Amino acid sequence: MIGRLRGYILEKQPPLVLLEANGVGYEVHMPMTCFYELPELGQEAIVFTQFVVREDAQLLYGFNDKQERALFRELIKVNGVGPKLALAILSGMSAQQFVSAVEREEITSLVKLPGVGKKTAERLVVEMKDRFKGLNGDLFNNSSEITLPTAAQAAELDAEAEAASALVALGYKPQEASRMVSKIAKPGADCETLIRDALRAAL
């Protein structure tokens, strides 16, 4: 199993990054909260990975540290939460924000995440709260106050389609993704900024 990759970033297409390690290019799906922290193209990055096998595909998910990966591993064990939804959850809010929301039973915050309805949010609170007790690290032992970001203005017309596609990949419906992008669209920002602001506005 591939647990860690160290290599150079060849491509960045949210939420996918192509990382070259020892001459091999690995396509890694990353939560947008982790994607934002990646270095620029051509620079070296270290990614902690989780290999997921499906009937129709073999996918590699990546994270900036082991605690984020541990959280992802526990999320996909929750009934009704697969890798795609787990990725969307950790894209909509940071790992720390999610832990805080669960600990404080913030159902209203969780239902704003893509693909998370009231029943799923309630299930996340019930199941994940118990799972946190068995995990090590500051992330799971320090429930800080959740910070809900405010909407920011950003976008460039030639980046809007790319941003909308990334939101669809994270679980939003095409029409909803386009509406989210249009709502915060303003000339002057790249695709990554557009995606980040759209997700912030959704909260």
Curated annotation (Swiss-Prot):
Region of interest (Domain I), residue spans: 1-64
UniProt protein name: Holliday junction branch migration complex subunit RuvA
Keyword Nucleus belongs to the record: no
Main location: cytoplasm
Keywords per UniProt: Cytoplasm, DNA damage, DNA recombination, DNA repair, DNA-binding
Stated role: The RuvA-RuvB-RuvC complex processes Holliday junction (HJ) DNA during genetic recombination and DNA repair, while the RuvA-RuvB complex plays an important role in the rescue of blocked DNA replication forks via replication fork reversal (RFR). RuvA specifically binds to HJ cruciform DNA, conferring on it an open structure. The RuvB hexamer acts as an ATP-dependent pump, pulling dsDNA into and through the RuvAB complex. HJ branch migration allows RuvC to scan DNA until it finds its consensus sequence, where it cleaves and resolves the cruciform DNA.
Quaternary structure and partners: Homotetramer. Forms an RuvA(8)-RuvB(12)-Holliday junction (HJ) complex. HJ DNA is sandwiched between 2 RuvA tetramers; dsDNA enters through RuvA and exits via RuvB. An RuvB hexamer assembles on each DNA strand where it exits the tetramer. Each RuvB hexamer is contacted by two RuvA subunits (via domain III) on 2 adjacent RuvB subunits; this complex drives branch migration. In the full resolvosome a probable DNA-RuvA(4)-RuvB(12)-RuvC(2) complex forms which resolves the HJ.
Cellular localization per UniProt: Cytoplasm
A Gene Ontology BP annotation from the UniProt entry: DNA recombination
One GO CC term on file: Holliday junction resolvase complex
Top-rank taxon, per record: Bacteria
Origin species: Serratia proteamaculans (strain 568)
GO molecular function, one term: four-way junction helicase activity
Record remark: domains: Has three domains with a flexible linker between the domains II and III and assumes an 'L' shape. Domain III is highly mobile and contacts RuvB.
Positions of region (Flexible linker): 143-154
Statement: the UniProt record of this protein carries the keyword Cytoplasm: yes
Region (Domain II) residue spans: 65-142
Protein family according to the UniProt entry: Belongs to the RuvA family.
Gene3D superfamilies: 5' to 3' exonuclease, C-terminal subdomain (1.10.150.20), DNA helicase RuvA subunit, C-terminal domain (1.10.8.10), Nucleic acid-binding proteins (2.40.50.140)
Region Domain III: start-end pairs: 155-203
